[in-house]
Amino acid sequence: MKPKLSPIIFTPDNEPYLGRELLFHFDQLISSVMEQNSLTAPASHGHVLTDHQRMACQVIAQGISIALSIRELVRQGYLFGGHVLLRSLVERETILLYLHLHPEEIGRWNRGWHQGDAPSLSKMIDAIQSKLQHESPVRGKDLMSAMNSIMHAKPDSAPWNLVPLGENGVGHAVSKILNRPDLCDDLCANVIPTLVVIQAMMAAYFPDIKKPAQQIAQADAGHGADGATRRR
């Protein structure tokens, strides 16, 4: 009897990690974020925006796009690619939160946010923790260690694309990873709080927009709305 072949393209009805609890919550959050965006995006159309709002229009939209890209990679089983994108998502979340807590730093953004002028990701995380008076024993560089390893192909990134090969041990996947639910759960567990902050930053930078009637805990997976923010 021939083994059952996996579909070339997965759909929401047969994706490999369908039913994972954290993935379900990721989908709920996407629904809520897209609804919030459908209310927030029009507020950036045809209005004079502050420097902070222009920055937010760009970075929030990019963050949501990356989160949706990660979700599709999970659906198709490309978990390693999703983990690579995670750092880019976290960086945008951190920029939004950092400039919200340190509005005086917007000049660095306006100058191009160049390396050497803008703070590093780990330094922004440390500054955020200090501003919020969080006595965390973990420094920003330690929080980013695994993400940096995956991004820059360091030796300790090896476990993130290992797959079992039966009697032949394990190997490094070059394509879909369909039998590592732990990797799926880990990715979702990191994306969810990051996307929550990005959604909160919509309200922070555009406070006059009413909250969506559908909250995260009540969101129906799959409901969304298009609506790109536009800079002026």
Regions found by a protein language model. Give the residues of each.
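Short, contiguous, well-structured surface segments enriched in hydrophobic/aromatic residues
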Residues: S32-L73, H114
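Short runs of predominantly hydrophobic/aromatic residues within well-ordered alpha helices
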Residues: A56, G82, L86, G140-M144
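Short, hydrophobic, well-ordered secondary-structure elements
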Residues: I60-L101
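"Short basic amphipathic alpha-helical interaction patches in structured regions
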Residues: L85-R87, P103-G112
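Short, charged N-terminal helix-start/capping segments
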Residues: M1-E21, M55-G77
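Residue-level recognition of alpha-helical structural elements
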Residues: H52, R75-G82, E105, S136
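Long, charged low-complexity segments
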Residues: M1-H47, R108-R232
